[in-house]
Curated annotation (Swiss-Prot):
Gene symbol of the encoding locus: glpE
EC top class named in words: transferase
CDD domains: GlpE_ST (cd01444)
Coiled coil: none
A Pfam short name: Rhodanese
Main subcellular location of this protein, as a coarse class: cytoplasm
InterPro entries the UniProt entry points to: GlpE_sulfurtransferase (IPR050229), Rhodanese-like_dom (IPR001763), Rhodanese-like_dom_sf (IPR036873), Thiosulf_sulfurTrfase (IPR023695)
Protein name per Swiss-Prot or TrEMBL: Thiosulfate sulfurtransferase GlpE
Cited function: Transferase that catalyzes the transfer of sulfur from thiosulfate to thiophilic acceptors such as cyanide or dithiols. May function in a CysM-independent thiosulfate assimilation pathway by catalyzing the conversion of thiosulfate to sulfite, which can then be used for L-cysteine biosynthesis.
Domain of life: Bacteria
Entries under HAMAP family matching the protein: Thiosulf_sulfurtr
């Protein structure tokens, strides 16, 4: 089991999702998530954490995303401490994801 998470680019995150079925956890606030979020992202909040634990395999890769890639680091480290084996944080967060032209779902 890894003792820390790894920071990766938005494109590396997309490759993990496409090639290894990684779960992307978006930790931004509900309003922003509802407005737009990466395609198929799980909205991880204090309230949804139990469902997250039920749905996500501890051995599968988990990628955490926030607004700019800062607060996701704390959540990524928390998930490592909870026993997840492969945890990543997206450099640049959702802003970087969107600028990279990767798939997003929007309310508009």
């Amino acid at each position: 089991m890894s003792e820390t998470f790894t920071e990766i680019s938005p494109h590396q995150a997309w490759e993990l999702i496409e090639n290894e079925g990684a779960t992307l956890a978006d930790i931004r606030d509900g309003r922003r998530y509802a407005y737009s979020h990466p395609q198929d992202a799980f909205h991880l909040t204090n309230e949804s954490y139990g469902r997250f634990l039920d749905e996500v395999d501890y051995e599968e890769p988990v990628i955490v995303m926030c607004y700019h890639g800062v607060s996701s680091r704390n959540t990524a480290q928390f998930l490592v401490e909870q026993g997840f084996d492969r945890v990543y944080s997206v450099k640049g967060g959702f802003d970087g994801w969107e600028r990279s032209g990767l798939p997003i779902e929007t309310a508009y």
